[in-house]
Amino acid sequence: MAKVEQVLSLEPQHELKFRGPFTDVVTTNLKLGNPTDRNVCFKVKTTAPRRYCVRPNSGIIDAGASINVSVMLQPFDYDPNEKSKHKFMVQSMFAPTDTSDMEAVWKEAKPEDLMDSKLRCVFELPAENDKPHDVEINKIIPTTASKTETPTVSKALSSSLDDTEVKKVMEECKRLQSEVQRLREENKQFKEEDGLRMRKTAQSNSPAPASAMAGKEEGLSTRLLALVVLFFIVGVIIGKIAL
């Protein structure tokens, strides 16, 4: 026996479109209209009842009236490569005289009295979703840029400070070099004087001047050694600053 044609008008007729993002509940509306002169009972069914919440999912539409049904898709991990196989069916029949127990009405309904329409579900990610994403990227990029500028400024300041320290150390090195040169000249002069004194001492056989000369040489050697150590320390400091 041929199925009775659906008397209700559906908007949309064939597809229920859900626009993402799907990280929160997404709601779409289905409008059911009753263009007849009789009241019509309806019921909305789905192949994935755990994924959707339908309000109202059943009821009676008066003659010439219409009703909006909210279909709420629950949050889920959306995969654009996965096609939705979810479907909805709007089942209807003309309301009997007694509608006090709708559960019994549906149970006692004859198959030939039932009318149904099927709709498939479509998931979409609209182009508008890309705009907030671009805004977020624009927000992130300046933030990242500002963060990268800070180390650059720090490096510049550090570099200028290092240059100042190097200049000071170089000036100190020049001063120490001059001091070493002066001490070398003094040492040379002392040696010449000591040579003369030693010759005189040898002639006079006096040990006292020899002790004095040894003390002077020891003092000069100690000062030279201290300068060499200082040069070594300065060299290490320059090496660290250069790195």
Swiss-Prot record:
Q: Tell me how this protein sits in the membrane.
A: Single-pass type IV membrane protein
Question: What's written under domain?
Answer: The MSP domain binds the FFAT motif of many proteins.
- Segments passing through the bilayer: 219-239
Q: Where in the numbering of this chain does the MSP domain appear?
A: 7-124
Species for this entry: Bos taurus
Where on this protein does the Glycyl lysine isopeptide (Lys-Gly) (interchain with G-Cter in SUMO1) crosslink form? Answer: 147
Q: What's in the keyword line of the UniProt record?
A: Acetylation, Coiled coil, Endoplasmic reticulum, Isopeptide bond, Membrane, Phosphoprotein, Transmembrane, Transmembrane helix, Ubl conjugation, Unfolded protein response
- Protein function: Endoplasmic reticulum (ER)-anchored protein that mediates the formation of contact sites between the ER and endosomes via interaction with FFAT motif-containing proteins such as STARD3 or WDR44. Interacts with STARD3 in a FFAT motif phosphorylation dependent manner. Via interaction with WDR44 participates in neosynthesized protein export. Participates in the endoplasmic reticulum unfolded protein response (UPR) by inducing ERN1/IRE1 activity. Involved in cellular calcium homeostasis regulation.
Tell me which stretches of the chain form a coiled coil.
161-196
BP terms from Gene Ontology: endoplasmic reticulum membrane organization; endoplasmic reticulum-plasma membrane tethering; intracellular calcium ion homeostasis; IRE1-mediated unfolded protein response
Chain ranges on the Cytoplasmic side, renumbered to this chain = 2-218
Q: Which GO terms describe its cellular component?
A: endoplasmic reticulum membrane; plasma membrane
Assign the protein's first listed, main location to one coarse class.
endoplasmic reticulum
Which residue windows does the record flag with biased composition (Basic and acidic residues)? 186-197
Q: Which residues carry this modification: Phosphothreonine?
A: 150
- Give the sites modified to Phosphoserine: 146, 158-160, 206
Keyword match Acetylation: yes
The opening ranks of the lineage are:
Eukaryota, Metazoa, Chordata, Craniata, Vertebrata
Q: Give the multimer and partner information.
A: Homodimer, and heterodimer with VAPA. Interacts with VAMP1 and VAMP2. Interacts (via MSP domain) with ZFYVE27. Interacts with RMDN3. Interacts with KIF5A in a ZFYVE27-dependent manner. Interacts (via MSP domain) with STARD3 (via phospho-FFAT motif). Interacts with STARD3NL (via FFAT motif). Interacts with CERT1. Interacts with PLEKHA3 and SACM1L to form a ternary complex. Interacts with VPS13A (via FFAT motif).
Question: Which GO MF terms are attached to this record?
Answer: protein-membrane adaptor activity
Q: Where is this region: Disordered?
A: 186-214
Name the family the entry cites: Belongs to the VAMP-associated protein (VAP) (TC 9.B.17) family.
The modified positions for N-acetylalanine read 2
Marked site: Involved in binding the phosphorylated serine of the phospho-FFAT motif: 43
Protein name, entry field: Vesicle-associated membrane protein-associated protein B
